[in-house]
Amino acid sequence: MTEPSDLLAERRQKLERLRAEGIEPFPHEFGEREDIGEVRAAHSGLAPGIETESRHRVAGRVVARRGHGKAAFLDLRDGTGQIQLHAREDVLGQEAFELLVHLDLGDIIGVEGTALATRRGELSIQVTRWRLLAKSLRPLPDKYHGLEDTETRYRRRELDLLANEDTRRTFRVRAQTISEVRRWLDDHGFAEVETPVLQPLYGGALARPFVTHHNALDRDLYLRIATELYLKRLVVGGIDRVYELGKDFRNEGISPKHNPEFTMLEWYEAYADYRKTAEDLERLVAEVAERVLGTTKIERDGKEIDLTPPWRRVTLREAIRERAGIDIAEHPSREALAAAMDTEPDPAEGWGKLVDGLLSRSVEPELIEPTFIVDYPVEISPFAKRHRSDEGLVERWEAFVGGVEIANSFTELNDPDEQRRRFEQQAEELRRGDEEAQPFDEAFVEALEQGMPPTGGVGLGIDRLVMILTGAPSLREVVLFPAMRT
């Protein structure tokens, strides 16, 4: 985003005039102050025309200015809200008044004054003292048109936040959502931990990693693609309820539902299974929505969605048969399923990858109401426990809302010999060219050999959850600085 050079030059000239007059345009501090939101709450019932003796000290950015003669009004905004400032020459004195009314939009100031309500009922602060806290050298985005170019909004998020109330609301919802998710887990006895972001082996998901190099150790390391394996080792160690909320990294494409750097929550509970985790997930999402939005009903693409439990459960086989007209159980080989799909798969795509593709293309977009797709093929779930009544399946679900997958869960595989066989199968897939297959993690297998109790685990995409709660059409709308192509 560029501004006319004469506007920039004019602001620079004002900066130099301030310094010439002995006014510091970038002081060190302002001291104790109140949030504007607190001031508004304290006087929410003030009747029109009433002036109080209640003194307040606030700071923020000047976003509007109007008035003439010996009185003026300015709008001041901080991170909690906006309030009108009433400035009068007979209160401030001529010099302070003139400096105030000639501020540029975007300048940051601190003010002291008393609360009043104008005859129209607008809560205001009668300014008695003020101070420049930061001179803005670039103009704000256009007041009426905002910042409309999508690419600029993502690259210059600070301008987007200044210009668009919808953006500010989105990221308030995001912050509150993360806070409420943590509160829910803490209240249910889970311990928050931190595990390595730089890992000697990547694992816990089917994805390509980012590779980096540690100079002192002279070895390659990987940015984690998931926290799963470390967290399950902690379950082995006796932390029966454990979670981590942080960044994962996957070297994959960018789309409305994918960003290479994303915020993921994983939690594990000893002595639970995928039925218990499904109940917990639907309760968590509904309770977070209620606390953040004040309702469990949201809107996406013009459709109302109720997050109230219980959510629908349907098997993967039933969902694909219903939406794609293919019974995957009747096509148990790669060749048979490819023929039924009328496709020529990539040599690295096995039967499981084809099933996953059917789910993504034919089923996922239709899952508007909250739905658990349950019971997946073992081929695409290397860390899930075999189904208790069908050896060809594993106990796994994925949760979908508004056509978006938001969470994934297993009854965790805790048989070390079976886990070793699964790793060997994944290693073979890796040798055949599947860049998303898992490398063999001997340390994890040895941890399982110590004995891991029956465990249920969940991965919840925080970015996608915020997408659902805000109605955002793309992940990039809910990530402050998303990855860009150029």
Language-model segments: residues:
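Class II aminoacyl-tRNA synthetase catalytic cores and aaRS-like
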Residues: 1-486
